[in-house]
């Protein structure tokens, strides 16, 4: 693994900090967790989690719910897309794994949701979408936004097993590799996916980070389905307070 003086922030609307020399594939001394809960009222001042320095790099995972909103009656709207993008912009995320995206769906004006999110942030992101399944004449799947300033060397997608179509997004930058995904609800599919993810990560000689909605938890009976496999190569770097408020054992989003 390459040494670096930079700091990585892991964000799933919960924050932790670690040196780049302590990548997601190994435990590291000096790790400190932010342990801050989810956003209850938009992007307030206390929710910005300022970076400690200009050289800090912030990683993030965020399930978009197709930008339908999480209050009132869920509905697709430009306002919801802009609200979603505002969180990313406020946190100044350098690279973001996003789940539940659509592209070209006839019932959603054939929008390219990931590109719309990127445009709404006003940040110079490279967009990487992984079409995982057919939906209403278009595609749905996960994606990644990565700042071009990180020096993107390569991007690719890897098919994963599942009752629904699943994909892994791989983004290699100058300093590290970032994997973004949304794993299946089927236990065996998640176990098989974890093996594939480990194999992909072992193909690189630099720090590798995995981020996404894993539909799995290290707190579940037996350590979950995917985690006993993933923890052979990865260590949890994000907060584990809980994906949903009031449900501390229901963390399923991780970096």
What is each PLM-predicted segment?
Residues 64-68, 101-105, 132-136, 150-151, ...:
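Solvent-exposed loop/turn segments at secondary-structure junctions
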Residues 48-60, 140-142, 147-152, 163-180:
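Beta-strand-turn-beta hairpins that frame and shape the catalytic cleft
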Residues 10-19:
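Bacterial N-terminal signal peptides
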Residues 109, 126-146, 161-164, 215-255:
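Active site of divalent-metal-dependent phosphoester/diester hydrolases
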Residues 22-120, 134:
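N-terminal, active-site-proximal structural segment of metallo-dependent hydrolase catalytic domains
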Residues 1-9:
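Bacterial N-terminal signal peptides that target proteins for export
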Residues 77-84, 97, 110-113, 117, ...:
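Stable alpha-helical elements in mature extracytoplasmic
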Residues 58-64, 84-110, 178-181, 193, ...:
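Active-site beta-strand/loop signature of hydrolases that rely on acidic residues for catalysis
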